[in-house]
Amino acid sequence: KEILSWYGSDNPGTLTNLTRILNHGKLGGSGKLVILPVDQGVEHGPGRTYVPNPPTFDPRYHFELALEAGLSAYAAPLGFLEAGARDYAGDLPLILKLNNRENLSSDKDPVQAVTGSIEAALRLGCAAIGYTVYPGSLQRVQMYEKLQALTEEAKPYFKLLADCGI
């Protein structure tokens, strides 16, 4: 309840979604949380990410991992969540990672493309959405502006969890 009191401008639906994350898993109710982020296969490539552990190629593996480990939530790109959201509906709070990038270029000034939407997060029953910003990037102003626009669009439904990538 104390944590929820810090979000006085949010509506009951948004607070309910935040509560789902805070009360789930082994740390549920402690005010602490652990989220399984599975977007590295997109950003760093499947060879580096999944080849060392072949079962990880199956998106459902990550749902099971998060559940067996008693984690607070599972965050992933749209395709990963679509692959298992129906089978695991209500079992685990989901976080849709709205933006992603790949490693096919040697871009020293990274920027992520928006690959998910608020509508998709609602359709999948997500408890929150995630977004990555690279603070040192020359594109940081555009990333912050997109983050602000998505935050405004998401506010009636979700907390937007921002990740500052390095």
What are these model-predicted stretches?
Residues 1-38:
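N-terminal basic, low-complexity leaders that serve as flexible interaction/assembly modules and, when applicable
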